[in-house]
Amino acid sequence: MNVPRETIAAIATAQGRGGVGIVRISGPLAGAAAKAISGRELKPRFAHYGPFLSEQEEVLDEGIVLYFPGPNSFTGEDVLELQGHGGPIVLDMLLQRCLELGCRLARPGEFSERAFLNDKLDLAQAEAIADLIEASSAQAARNALRSLQGAFSQRVYNLTEQLIALRIYVEAAIDFPEEEIDFLADGHVLSMLDAVRDELSTVLREAGQGALLRDGMTVVIAGRPNAGKSSLLNALAGREAAIVTDIAGTTRDILREHIHIDGMPLHVVDTAGLRDTEDQVEKIGVERALKAISEADRVLLVVDATAAEAADPFALWPEFLEQRPDPAKVTLIRNKADLTGEPIALETCDDGHVTISLSAMAAGSGLELLRDHLKACMGYEQTSESSFSARRRHLEALHYASAALEHGRAQLTLAGAGELLAEDLRQAQQSLGEITGAFSSDDLLGRIFSSFCIGK
């Protein structure tokens, strides 16, 4: 790749005061800067303690200097790290010294960008650095570290290799028709294609779990008026985020609350009560509620356990089932269990949905059970070696690849169109390449790395 030859410098530690502060340099001038600032020749990859010198050989600070000649460094270039005292004035003096020696200020994420351009890490690994820094829970940090170590990338590479093998077989049959390979009669292409589709489906599911841990899960609270939806929102938020009254229809619009459960981000959405109404404002609220339900990662369907309709809550509002057809993403909340006397409990039903009996208004009434359930939905304390962090753009690329394979399979089985299958396989491979950076536009790379910290 065409890697810039300018030497860059930046403060690599967070703003503010601390015991230690780091200034990082990368580029062809790093070796000369190391000698000028330390006043001596440095042994590569060894820590040297001593003064940091100005142009007039005045002592700016003292600390540890480390020199890593390329390509055996983080960026693949010559890298210098100055580890001094963590005061902002001291660090700024060291940074100014680097600029005097011919360095320029690094852009946000430029060190990681150079590591990517020098094939020291792929794009998914580079993004994992930022995810590890921004992790809001121990599980999110573990997943980000696994992605940084290449767990996610390896899954994508394995899929890509399978696609390449399949493309070779398909395109050989197209280019050499005299070999008379019959796609359908042979059965080999279909079996290979189905194997790739199955593996892609598994990776997509695991990536979705990783994205929930990174970006947060959108939880929509839905149900009839006066079922206790707003009370449940307040209980989860730990404050009076929503107005609670005995008057049906108090909540008429979407109310959003961002909360954390053991460091795990949740975007909780309270919605208008689901009912037929002639009130135009409330009707708009119901429409927005149904839209929120269709977009949710998880739906908490709240029912009043004291009401007769609680016996079959899903039958009360067929539009709900139309918007959220997957029962595995629905948690039925039987609220007001303290009034019915039913035990606080969680039950997984035959169709896949979960039922929790609790009371949103009573202390110690099952809310901890609900919190644990929501954490489990996000993959909290997941010990699987397959867990990794992922981003929304990764999911989009995986979905696009999956759609291309589905389309290619249909073209093959319905029309025997090997040429169309070959094009779909190419598109699927390109989508996977966008995850690791094998196929990425300059605009995409710029957007990704500009979101990083300066010095990373």
Swiss-Prot record:
Gene Ontology BP annotations: tRNA methylation; tRNA wobble uridine modification
The UniProt record lists the EC number as 3.6.-.-
Location in the cell reads:
Cytoplasm
User: Where, by residue number, does GTP bind?
Assistant: 226-231, 245-251, 270-273, 335-338
Q: Which GO terms describe its molecular function?
A: GTP binding; GTPase activity; metal ion binding
Give the highest taxon in the source lineage: Bacteria
Q: Cellular component per GO?
A: cytosol
What InterPro entries does this protein's entry cite? G_TrmE, GTP-bd, GTP-bd_TrmE_N, GTPase_MnmE, MnmE_dom2, MnmE_helical, P-loop_NTPase, Small_GTP-bd
Residues the record lists as binding (6S)-5-formyl-5,6,7,8-tetrahydrofolate: R24, E81, K120, K456
Keyword hit for Hydrolase: yes
Q: List residues binding K(+).
A: N226, T245, I247, T250
Annotated TrmE-type G domain ranges read: 216-379
Q: Which cofactor does it need?
A: K(+)
Q: What class of enzyme is it?
A: hydrolase
This protein's UniProt keywords: Cytoplasm, GTP-binding, Hydrolase, Magnesium, Metal-binding, Nucleotide-binding, Potassium, tRNA processing
Bound cofactor: record note: Binds 1 potassium ion per subunit.
- List of residues binding Mg(2+): S230, T251
The family classification in the record reads: Belongs to the TRAFAC class TrmE-Era-EngA-EngB-Septin-like GTPase superfamily. TrmE GTPase family.
Q: How does it assemble?
A: Homodimer. Heterotetramer of two MnmE and two MnmG subunits.
Stored NCBIfam families: mnmE_trmE_thdF, PRK05291.1-3, small_GTP
Please describe what this protein does. Exhibits a very high intrinsic GTPase hydrolysis rate. Involved in the addition of a carboxymethylaminomethyl (cmnm) group at the wobble position (U34) of certain tRNAs, forming tRNA-cmnm(5)s(2)U34.
- Protein name, as recorded: tRNA modification GTPase MnmE
Gene name in the database record: mnmE
